[in-house]
Amino acid sequence: MNVLSCSINTLIKEGLYEISGVEVGQHFYWQIGGFQVHAQVLITSWVVIAILLGSAVLVVRNPQTIPTDGQNFFEFVLEFIRDVSQTQIGEEYGPWVPFIGTLFLFIFVSNWSGALLPWKIIQLPQGELAAPTNDINTTVALALLTSVAYFYAGLSKKGLGYFSKYIQPTPILLPINILEDFTKPLSLSFRLFGNILADELVVVVLVSLVPLVVPIPVMFLGLFTSGIQALIFATLAAAYIGESMEGHH
C-alpha cells in the first residue's frame, strides 16, 4: 500500500510539474540585464509605434492652410477622440485626451497590423511574430496603465477622500468595491486578448483548410471587430476615469 501511494504521489507531482511548464505557442526571448524579455511583443510594438509616429510626422510637419487629405483624417480622429473623452469624462476631459487617444490608436493599429502586415514572413529562431495585442502581456500592461490612470484621476481630484467610495453606500460593500477595482483591468485585458487571439486563430485555420478567397470575408469581419475592440477599450478607460472623478458607480 505504501509503495502504491508513493507511486501515485510521484505521478501527481510529475504530472503537475509537466503541466506547469506548458506554454501556449513558442516564444522568442532576449536576455537583457538578467531579465528574460519577450522579444516578439517588443518587436511588433516598436513597429506599431514607428507607424504611428511616422505617419503623424509626415502629415503635421508641413501643415497647409487648405488641409490635405492626411490632415483632414488626423483632425477627424482627434475630434472623434475628443468626443469620446468628453462624453465619458465630462467637462474636465481635456487633460485626458492624449491618454485616451494614445490607447485607442495603439490598440487600433496593433489589431489591424495582425491582419494587414505579413508578420509570418519574418523568421525568428523560435516562434513567430503577431499583433502586439495577440499577447496577454500587452493587454495586461494596457489595462494596468488604465488602472493607474483612474486611481491618479480620483486622488488628484479628491485627495485621500477618494477612498471613501469603498464604504459607500454602506461599509458592508467594502470587499465588493475593492474586488471591483481588481476586476476592471482583468476584464479589459482578457476581453481584448481573447478577441484578437480568436480572430487570428480563425483566419489561420480557414486559410489552412480552404482556398484563400474563402477566408477573405472573415478577414474583413476581423478588421471591423478589431476596430470595435479598440473603441471599447478606450471608451471604458475614459468611463473609469470619469467615474473616479465624479465618485458615482
Curated annotation (Swiss-Prot):
Signal peptide: none annotated. Its main location: plastid. This is ATP synthase subunit a, chloroplastic. Belongs to the ATPase A chain family. F-type ATPases have 2 components, CF(1) - the catalytic core - and CF(0) - the membrane proton channel. CF(1) has five subunits: alpha(3), beta(3), gamma(1), delta(1), epsilon(1). CF(0) has four main subunits: a, b, b' and c. It holds the Pfam family ATP-synt_A. Key component of the proton channel; it plays a direct role in the translocation of protons across the membrane. It is a multi-pass membrane protein. The chain crosses the membrane at residues 40-60, 97-117, 136-156, 201-221, 222-242. Keywords: ATP synthesis, CF(0), Chloroplast, Hydrogen ion transport, Ion transport, Membrane, Plastid, Thylakoid, Transmembrane, Transmembrane helix, Transport.
